[in-house]
Amino acid sequence: MAVRIRLTRLGRKKMPFYRLVVADSEAKRDGKFLDIVGTYDPMQDPAVITINDEKLQDWVGRGALPTTTVKSLLKKAAANK
């Protein structure tokens, strides 16, 4: 089972809000996930990225790989701190 850190879409039509979740790579985009490690709200100005660093490091230590989109969000979040 390959585990990925990726985005799941929430919100309503034309008003997206995303969760950063840890999920099996074969699960559906908005399907079953293992843990929530953060949120991303692109509709705010500037966009709001909230990450639980403790959970994130725990999952990365276990071998979870972030998607390219999540990697770029993590870089932006680190730059804003």
Curated annotation (Swiss-Prot):
GO terms for cellular component: cytoplasm; small ribosomal subunit. Keywords: Ribonucleoprotein, Ribosomal protein. InterPro entries: Ribosomal_bS16, Ribosomal_bS16_CS, Ribosomal_bS16_dom_sf. GO terms for molecular function: structural constituent of ribosome. This is Small ribosomal subunit protein bS16. Belongs to the bacterial ribosomal protein bS16 family. One of its GO terms (biological process) is translation.
